[in-house]
Amino acid sequence: AFEAAVAGGIPIIKALREGLTANRIQYIAGIINGTTNYILSEMRERGLDFATALAGAQALGYAEADPTFDIEGVDAAHKLTIMCAIAFGVPMQFDRAYVEGISKLDATDIKYAEDLGYRIKLLGIARRTARGIELRVHPTLIPAKRLIASVEGAMNAVEVHGDAVGATLYYGKGAGAEPTASAVVADLVDVTRLHTADPEHRVPHLAFQPQSLSDTPVLPIEEVTSGYYLRLRVADVTGVLADVTRLLADAGISIDAMLQREAEQIAGDGQTDVVIITHET
């Protein structure tokens, strides 16, 4: 009975709780906040800075007068916590989630990411690993060829991987009167149906009976392995690039891709940007 709380009109809760019941869910990755996705789309497509894109979202009613919960990733983390509980059979642990929003993103980073073949989206990611569960919301570079990277505007999408079905993608409106009403009616029907069954044979709201919940730990972000995006503003002098790569190598960090801009394209003050994407570390 949480359909209206997550991803608007997308029936992702029923998919996780019932449609994919034969699967051991491996991970979930979702664009689950329409406000931030709209802002990022405007920054990429029109080259707007964050403040201008946010003002546009507020003018259209996509963002609240106080947009903190949206732009700082809190709303997405709430939704991700519900999906994680249903997918992995763990208690809701919002306080253990790593949450980072988009307010510090620069249009320059969005352009560099695109030059390297990526798009930046605010993703909610829940992943089952041998050591525990990853539960995190943050800006993420997604290869542009992936379907979820093409989700623009205020739309939502959730990618779910199961061991039997493989990759599945759920796409639709994440907010609005009619999509939300559709989800609310689904919740009401679900609750009514549950009350016609005896407690022992009901499908629990969170898919698992309380006594069956796992105590699998949520991993702190320091224990999560991932590739990273780095943008370094450096002096445009001979040997700087070699110094940067040597420092990364000394730290055991491997470079996957690198991009360097001419100094005159940056500030004309003898500085340049070096953009690096690392391998998982």
Regions of interest found by a model, annotated:
Residues 13-17, 37-41, 51-58, 77-85, ...:
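Predominant activation on well-ordered alpha-helical scaffold segments within soluble catalytic domains
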Residues 2-63, 70-75, 82:
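Rossmann-like NAD(P)H-binding beta-loop-alpha module
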Residues 27, 39, 121-122, 136, ...:
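Structured core elements
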Residues 138-163, 177-178, 245, 249-269:
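Low-complexity, glycine/alanine/valine/leucine- and proline-rich hydrophobic stretches
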Residues 52-150, 155-157, 176:
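Substrate-binding/catalytic subdomain of NAD(P)-dependent oxidoreductase enzymes
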Residues 183, 188-281:
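A conserved regulatory-domain signal marking ACT and ACT-like small-molecule sensing domains
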Residues 46-49, 87-94, 192-197:
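Short helix-capping/linker segments at secondary-structure and domain boundaries
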Residues 166-168, 172-178:
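Glycine-rich phosphate/pyrophosphate-binding beta-alpha loops
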